[in-house]
Amino acid sequence: SPQGLLRLVSHLPALAKLPVVFHVETPQALHAHVLQLRHSGISMVYSSGEPRETEAYALFAHILAAKTHTGALHFFDTVSANNLPSTQASLLQVPLAPEPSELSDVTINGIFSDVNERLGTDIQPLRVLGAHATDTVAVMLGAETTKLSAYVPIVSLHLVRPLSARCLVDSIPTSVKRVAVLEH
């Protein structure tokens, strides 16, 4: 549970240096407890709870941990267990890298490509939703992104940590003058 993670706070810096993955369901899209762990050194991956997306980001977290020898936290909104897809075991057999890879944009983009190829998905570190011709954009994560994108463009985060500044800046249209960061 998200509250249970708070008991691990003192251990997370050490766990961040090990290839471990935590999967945490965030009921009712309440991310406050999970987001308190941003400064722990552990990578953080978010998925909205759509079963196929949740499966893909979970696999991304495992490959990230295996290739970089770093800990990862995959948190996702509540999903119905009956709707979860069944991933073949062969997809999850990712050997530990003999030498840890540097946690760089190149490594991360390679892992996203690997997962998309294996599962036939199109997951990304972030996604821009809604209209692009505006002077305001909101950056956020959560299930509400789809609803709000009808009013203002939304940059929906999926790779919360490490957050690529280059990727974030490149995703914002040049017409934008104001950026709102929405956190709940």
Go through each PLM region and give its residues.
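Thiamine diphosphate
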Residues: 1-33, 39, 44-65, 118-184
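Gly/Ser/Thr-rich loops at beta-strand to alpha-helix junctions
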Residues: 1-5, 51-53, 79-81, 140-147, ...
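Generic secondary-structure signature for well-ordered alpha-helical cores
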Residues: 10, 14-17, 39, 56-70, ...
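Short beta-strand segments
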Residues: 21-25, 47-48, 73-77, 140-141, ...
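Conformationally flexible catalytic loops at phosphate/diphosphate-handling active centers
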Residues: 69-128
